[in-house]
C-alpha cells in the first residue's frame, strides 16, 4: 500500500514570477503527495545548489526544466517500488543518486521537492495530519511568528541595508491571537507611514519598503505602530531583525550605504548593542557575514546571554557546519530552511543537533515562495517554537499562517502557543 508507483514533476512559478519545481508522488494505495520548492534571494555560499537551466532566452536563464527532467527520469526510476514510509531510506537514495556534496548534479530543488512530496504522501496514506506524521504524537507547540513588516536589503528597492524588521507577538495566549495582533500592527504601521508621506508598497516578503532616514527610524515607526494598535512594546510584542550582513560586507568592512557608515565587526556589534538597549530587540539573524567566524564568536560573547543570535547564511541548515559553530561558540540559534540542505531527513538531523546543543530552531520560508505550507507543519511537528514566514499580506506568506490556524484548531486544548514561554525567558513576568 505504501509502495511508490509514480513520481512526476512540473515547472511552476513562485511568488516572484520565477520558475520552481513542483513534485507529485503517487502510492500503490492511491494516496498522493504534492510539494513545491521555494527559492532565496540572499543566499549562503555553502547552500545546496538550486539547479537552473541557464538558457537566457527562456525565463532569463531561471528555468528549471533540467531539474524537472531529473525528477521525471532518474529520480523516478530510483524511487518507484520503494516504501514511502521509509523517509530516511528515500532521502538516502536521493543523496547517493546525486553523489555530490552540494547536490549540484540533480539539484537540491529537484531532490527537496521529491523528499517533501514523499512525506506528504505518507501522511495522506496513514490519514494523519502532516505535522503529526513529521513529529509524532508530541507535536503540539504553536510557534511564535517573526513577522516581517519592514523590508530592506535584497528584499526591497529602498535605502535600508538591514533586510528585515520583524515583530514577535509574545504576549498572545494563542497563535490565533498572535496573528490578529500582527495584522493589526501591520495595518496601523501602513497608516503611520502613509500619513508621513512614505511609500507603502511592499517588498518580496510583504513588508513595507519605505525610504527612511536611518535604521533606528524603522524601529521607531514599529514601536509607534505597536502602541497605536493598543499593545505594549516588550510586554506584548518583541522585535527582531534579519540583517543579512553578508550582503553588505565589502572588502572586510560592513558598509551601510543607506546611512553612509562603515564598520568592522566590533563596530557592527556596537551598532546592534545600541538597538538592544533602546528597543525590545530580542533576536538578530545574520548580524555578521557568513565567513566572519571570529566576529560571530565575539558577538555571541557580548550579546548571547541577552538575546537570540540566529545563524542563517552562517549555518545553511547543514548539520556539519552547525557542529562547527557549536564547537566555536558562534550563535545560540539556527534558521531552518529546507532548501538550503535539500532533503527532509537532513533538515530534521540539523534541528535535532541544534536542540541537543541548546540552540533554538527558527523554521523559515524563503523570499521566493509558493502556496505550499509544509513549513507550518514542520514547525509544529518538531516543536520548533518559532517560525519566520513573512508579513501579513501576500497569499504565499498567509498560506503558512492560515495552516497554523488550522493546526491550532485541530489540536484543540492540546496545542500550546510558545509566546508566553518566550516572553518569560526574555522579559520575566509582568
Swiss-Prot record:
Metal-binding in keyword set: yes
Q: Which PROSITE patterns match?
A: ENOLASE
Q: What is its EC number?
A: 4.2.1.11
Kindly state what the record says about how the cofactor is bound. Binds a second Mg(2+) ion via substrate during catalysis.
Instruction: List UniProt keywords, sorted A-Z.
Output: Cytoplasm, Glycolysis, Lyase, Magnesium, Metal-binding, Secreted
Q: Which CDD domains match?
A: enolase
List required co-factors: Mg(2+)
Report any one BP term from Gene Ontology.
Answer: glycolytic process
Q: Which residues bind (2R)-2-phosphoglycerate?
A: 163, 337, 366-367, 388
Q: What class of enzyme is it?
A: lyase
Tell me the residue numbers annotated for binding Mg(2+).
Answer: 242, 285, 312
> Which SMART domains does the record associate with it?
Enolase_C (SM01192), Enolase_N (SM01193)
Q: In which pathway does it act?
A: Carbohydrate degradation; glycolysis; pyruvate from D-glyceraldehyde 3-phosphate: step 4/5
Q: Give the UniProt subcellular location, in the record's own words.
A: Cytoplasm; Secreted; Cell surface
Q: Which GO terms describe its cellular component?
A: cell surface; extracellular region; phosphopyruvate hydratase complex
Q: Which residues form the active site?
A: 205 (proton donor), 337 (proton acceptor)
- Top-rank taxon: Bacteria
What family does the Swiss-Prot or TrEMBL record give for this protein? Belongs to the enolase family.
Protein name (database record)? Enolase
User: Which species is this record about?
Assistant: Maridesulfovibrio salexigens (strain ATCC 14822 / DSM 2638 / NCIMB 8403 / VKM B-1763) (Desulfovibrio salexigens)
Amino acid at each position: 500500500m505504501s509502495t511508490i508507483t509514480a513520481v512526476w514533476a512540473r515547472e511552476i512559478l513562485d511568488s516572484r514570477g520565477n520558475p520552481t519545481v513542483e513534485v507529485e508522488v503517487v502510492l500503490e494505495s492511491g494516496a498522493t503527495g504534492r510539494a513545491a520548492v521555494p527559492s532565496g534571494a540572499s543566499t549562503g555560499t555553502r547552500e545546496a545548489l538550486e539547479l537552473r537551466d541557464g538558457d537566457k532566452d527562456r525565463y532569463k536563464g531561471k528555468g528549471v526544466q533540467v531539474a524537472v527532467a531529473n525528477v521525471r527520469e532518474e529520480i523516478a526510476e530510483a524511487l518507484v517500488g520503494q516504501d514511502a514510509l521509509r523517509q530516511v531510506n528515500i532521502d538516502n537514495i536521493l543523496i547517493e543518486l546525486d553523489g555530490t556534496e552540494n547536490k549540484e548534479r540533480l539539484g537540491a530543488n529537484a531532490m527537496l521537492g521529491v523528499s517533501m512530496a514523499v512525506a506528504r504522501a505518507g501522511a495522506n496514506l496513514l490519514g494523519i495530519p502532516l505535522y503529526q506524521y513529521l513529529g509524532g504524537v508530541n507535536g503540539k507547540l504553536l510557534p511564535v511568528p517573526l513577522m516581517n513588516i519592514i523590508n530592506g536589503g535584497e528584499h526591497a528597492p529602498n535605502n535600508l541595508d538591514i533586510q528585515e524588521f520583524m515583530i514577535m507577538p509574545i504576549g498572545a495566549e494563542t497563535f490565533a491571537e498572535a496573528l490578529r495582533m500582527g495584522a493589526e500592527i501591520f495595518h496601523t504601521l501602513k497608516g503611520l507611514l502613509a500619513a508621513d508621506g512614505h511609500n507603502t508598497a511592499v517588498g518580496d516578503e510583504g513588508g513595507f519598503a519605505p525610504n527612511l532616514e536611518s535604521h533606528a527610524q524603522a524601529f521607531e515607526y514599529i514601536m509607534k505602530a505597536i502602541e497605536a494598535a493598543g499593545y505594549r512594546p516588550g510586554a506584548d510584542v518583541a522585535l527582531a531583525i534579519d540583517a543579512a550582513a553578508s550582503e553588505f560586507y565589502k572588502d572586510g568592512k560592513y558598509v551601510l550605504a543607506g546611512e553612509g557608515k562603515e564598520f568592522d565587526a566590533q563596530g557592527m556589534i556596537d551598532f546592534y548593542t545600541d538597538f538592544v538597549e533602546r528597543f525590545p530587540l530580542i533576536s538578530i539573524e545574520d548580524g555578521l557575514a557568513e565567513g566572519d567566524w571570529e566576529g560571530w564568536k565575539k558577538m555571541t560573547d557580548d550579546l548571547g546571554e541577552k538575546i537570540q543570535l540566529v545563524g542563517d547564511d552562517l549555518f545553511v541548515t547543514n548539520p556539519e557546519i552547525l557542529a562547527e559553530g557549536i564547537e566555536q561558540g558562534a550563535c545560540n540559534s539556527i534558521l531552518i530552511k529546507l532548501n538550503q540542505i535539500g532533503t527532509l531527513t537532513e533538515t530534521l538531523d540539523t534541528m535535532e543537533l541544534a536542540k541537543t546543543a541548546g540552540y533554538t530552531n527558527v523554521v523559515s520560508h524563503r523570499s521566493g515562495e509558493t502556496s505550499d505550507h509544509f513549513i507550518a507543519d514542520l514547525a509544529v511537528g518538531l516543536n520548533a517554537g518559532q517560525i519566520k514566514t513573512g508579513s501579513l499580506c501576500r497569499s504565499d506568506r498567509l498560506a503558512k499562517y492560515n495552516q497554523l490556524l488550522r493546526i491550532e484548531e485541530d489540536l484543540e486544548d492540546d496545542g500550546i502557543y510558545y509566546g508566553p514561554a518566550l516572553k518569560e525567558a526574555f522579559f520575566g513576568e509582568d
